[in-house]
Amino acid sequence: MPGHKGRFGAPALQKATALDITEITGADSLFEASGILAESEKNASSLYGTAYTFYSCGGSTLCIQTMLLLMKQQGRRVLAARNVHRAFLNACVLLDIPVQWIYPRKSDGILSGTYDLADFEAALQAQTRPACVYV
């Protein structure tokens, strides 16, 4: 798996590496999809009601960086949960993007905290300009 260097934390997931066919000849190209991947991107666009869908050639890090750059160019505010991916934090620092953090509620379970949709809705409604939410 690109980005994971063929390693997975759980031994049960080791078999999943055999399912990564993106690098096999004839399986289409993530960089310039024209076959099955292009068809899948078109289907995803239809499913999510978007004009276009493009699968990432650079994994989740590239997708996160792209989303944040687009939001910054549009002057939109970024709201985020506190348990974000490291790539999100790094991109915010590099792009000089301030983040409005949504803090978790205390949990008595095994998780250190939980999030409630109402907290995100309230934060969005308080915005004067459209915002994006990273969860």
Tell what function each PLM region has.
Residues M1-T17:
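N-terminal glycine-rich, Lys/His-bearing helix-loop that initiates the first secondary-structure elements
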Residues L95-I97:
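Short, structured coil segments at secondary-structure junctions
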Residues I24-T25, W101-Y103, P130-V135:
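Short beta-strands and strand-loop turn motifs
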Residues A81-R82, W101-K106:
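Short beta->alpha connector loops at strand-helix junctions that form conserved
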Residues I110-V135:
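Active-site phosphate-binding strand-loop segment of PLP-dependent enzymes
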Residues Q14-L62, N83:
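Conserved N-terminal alpha-helix of the aminotransferase class I/II PLP-enzyme fold
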Residues Y52-R77, R86-A91:
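Conserved beta-loop-alpha segment that forms the PLP phosphate-binding cup at the N-terminus of a helix
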